[in-house]
Regions:
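Helix-to-loop junction immediately C-terminal to a conserved catalytic motif
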Residues: 2
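Conserved ABC transporter NBD signature motif
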Residues: 10-21, 33
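Conserved ABC ATPase "signature" region
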Residues: 18, 72-90, 199-200
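Conserved ABC ATPase signature
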Residues: 95-99, 103
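A short, proline-enriched helix->beta-strand linker immediately N-terminal to the Walker B motif
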Residues: 114-118
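Short catalytic/signature loops enriched in Gly
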Residues: 182-209
Length: 209
């Protein structure tokens, strides 16, 4: 969708603009869209450069898009982003190996927010985290969405997480969209067998036996 890898088929339309169309051989330059569209990766360990400080990781997008006029403005923005995701100013000078998985994912989120995007692809952003940390990160995603007016494409296989954060849910099976509905409607009245199998895997606090 973000064309980090070139699609092999189909059409991508964003905000009414065709970004990619295989049949029509359309593939627009994505640079103008990089600020508007960002991604949070699944693996908080592999997605951060171990040779860079946290401050430089978060600041990389700021530098590429020339978003700050001077070093002080850049520094202040980086610290503000770290604090927004639950980290602090001291973390800016540290390296990824000094952090837990949950903290690294917060760094990844701060990096995505650094260019003030409007749309973020969240690619299984909590699947590699402990359950207790998952809840914290999902709640943070919700808070950031409210504060910044963000739109998420939240990719996950755990419907208990998806239903908590999503307004609409689309279910993919064998590479095709088999069901799309409002979150409550899909959970309450699913049609496709694969959707039902995902729902049946959601833990129930007080199951009736």
């Amino acid at each position: 969708l973000l064309r980090l890898y070139e699609p092999t088929d189909g059409t991508i339309i964003y905000d009414g603009k065709v970004l990619f169309d295989k049949k029509e051989k359309i593939a627009v330059d994505m640079l103008p869209y990089r600020r508007r569209m960002q991604i949070v990766f699944q693996d908080p360990y592999a997605s951060l450069d171990p040779r860079m400080t946290i401050g430089d990781i978060v600041g990389e997008g700021i530098d590429i898009h020339h978003l700050c006029a001077n070093a002080k403005e850049r520094h202040d923005k980086i610290i503000s982003l770290l604090e927004r995701v639950g980290l602090n100013s001291e973390h800016a000078n540290r390296y990824p190996h000094e952090f837990s998985g949950g903290q690294r994912q917060r760094v990844g989120i701060a990096r995505a927010l650094a260019v003030d995007p409007e749309f973020i692809v969240c690619d299984e952003p909590v699947s590699a985290l402990d359950v207790s940390i998952q809840a914290q990160v999902v709640n943070m995603f919700e808070d950031l969405q409210q504060e910044m007016g963000l739109t998420y494409l939240f990719i996950a296989h755990d419907l208990s997480v998806v239903k908590h954060i999503s307004n609409r849910i689309g279910v993919m099976y064998l590479g095709k969209m088999v069901e799309l509905a409002d979150s409550f409607e899909l959970i309450a009245h699913s049609v496709h067998p694969y959707t039902r199998s995902l729902i049946s895997a959601i833990p129930v606090a007080d199951p009736v036996t």
